[in-house]
Amino acid sequence: MKHLALILSISLLLATYANAAPVVFIVRHAEKASADDKNPDLSVQGQKRADALAHILKDSQITSVFVTEFKRTQETAAPTARAGHVSPTVIPANDIGALVEKLRALNGNALVVGHGNTIPDLLKALGIATPVSIPEDDYTEIFAVFVGDAAQLLRLHYPF
């Protein structure tokens, strides 16, 4: 039921802005298996969150998926990319400028899976004035950014 409410919210949002600028959904990678490994896989909970993201975004007409060089971002995006038959584009985590350039050139909606320490800078670079911080243990945020002359932000949360 919680998934349904979120899906309906996103569908209404997309219908409202159908003729407007593309929507970029930005999420932090899902929970990782080990804090000790520099490039860990997702944990079981993280895999569940990645699957939930694909379900949440299934009607969002995602045409581009952007991930970093780290497995946790790639594994978080994989179910959504598979569902939309989209090959993810890898952009280095520290190259926000290159990512912003690609996002501003979009003709469709996109998913960006990043990191808690890079998403605030990405949002700022896209024109979101309100500062955002993501606690180290928070994997629940979904940022929907309407990329255009005046970027707008809608903050959503996973239902778990």
What are these regions (language model features)?
Residues 113-115:
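Short beta-strand segments
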Residues 21-107, 119-160:
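Active-site-proximal alpha-helix that buttresses catalytic centers in soluble enzyme cores
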Residues 5-15:
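Bacterial N-terminal signal peptides
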Residues 16-20:
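Sec/Tat signal peptide C-region and signal peptidase I cleavage site
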Residues 1-2:
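N-terminal hydrophobic targeting signals that begin at the initiator methionine
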Residues 109-111:
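Acidic/histidine-rich alpha-helical segments that form the ligand environment
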